[in-house]
């Protein structure tokens, strides 16, 4: 209702641009009328709701582009990106054209029309070209890929590793006794280790190695701000996971979900002899902090 009144977004703390129409969820049918493209932007915690309540009413002849980043781990250690989960959970007999966005692009800077580069991925290149033609601007730059697993898993992983890199921020603040203290050497060391482990994970899921550009870029921008940096910093200062979560009460933390699922998948693969846990020291350390009280 506030957006309808004055275009002011209370979370972004910005007045959005003219030409945008706003609808309540009860007005979904009206909003879909004449649409050329549908964008889905729920958090990973809204995945079940989106699958159960929204997918059944979406038209099949309009492509869907989702910004939800995440993976689900299966019993054998396989990591499945959300676009594949959406596809599996659409109503029987329905064939929605699923596509997704990956890459470093914060909502705040996009709202300010800051230059950004992302990847659109999906099964059909012609559909991707059509979507790109609708959304490309002089500040929003788009690459296309049919490697959905590679793109989406790369950008999902970064949430876990951004938490790991942010530990160095909290460690610096604890050592110096100063909030905002910065030590780039330690952050860079963890960043490099994170990218190394992400490359290894991409190999395991058979994602193209070229997709690391999207994951590494997303890792970079996530470390510099946002919810994941906050939780990593608090943990680095020495707070327990429960203490840190209490301080951030009400904040959605997808990094916790991704770190837990990815570590669990790696452990299962290690049990099968596919990988060694020694190849993922940063991921295992993050998992130990958030799930084992380390």
Describe each model-derived feature in a short phrase.
Residues 16, 158, 163-169, 173, ...:
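NAD(P)-dependent Rossmann-like dehydrogenase/reductase catalytic/cofactor-binding core
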Residues 16-115, 131:
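Rossmann-like NAD(P)(H) cofactor-binding subdomain of soluble oxidoreductases
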Residues 57, 89-97, 115-210:
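Internal alpha-helical scaffold of NAD(P)-dependent oxidoreductase catalytic cores
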Residues 41-42, 122, 290:
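Conserved residues at beta->alpha junctions
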Residues 44-48, 142-148, 286:
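Glycine-rich anion/phosphate-binding loops
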Residues 1-16:
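Glycine-rich phosphate-binding loop and adjoining beta1-alpha1-beta2 segment
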Residues 71-74, 151-152, 221, 251:
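Short, small-residue-enriched loops and turns at beta-alpha junctions
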